[in-house]
């Protein structure tokens, strides 16, 4: 790549400028201020969940790639991306370890308040996606009794 791409990135995405500047000119902006006129001649758009990505934002733009630094896609009109032939990538599971550790930390707090030892605690896990599978792994390492439901 010769560094000729126009890239707009949410300023809250850590290291976006360092990671993408070798591909082109990176403009960092407030994710809430990203609008159609700002990205009209942009090749790559990097967003977080604060940016609603839909036809209103993308219509008549030259966008070729959308990257989202999120694990979900509620803020993105994927059908519009497909019909517009805009490539898309997001980050499913990217926060799963942190969330699993938060869940287990909550159990530690509950343990302290109830004086129930870990060996007597029971953990219910619904689903074994990115987070549930990590909660299960940590729970097993801590010898917790696990009840699971793959729904």
Question: What kind of feature is each model-predicted range?
Answer:
Residues 25-37:
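A short, well-structured beta->alpha microelement
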Residues 15-26:
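A short, Lys/Arg-enriched amphipathic alpha-helix followed by its capping loop at the start of a domain
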Residues 10-16, 31-34, 49-52, 150-151:
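Short, polar loop motifs at secondary-structure junctions
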Residues 115-151:
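Rossmann-like dinucleotide/phosphate-binding beta-alpha-beta segment
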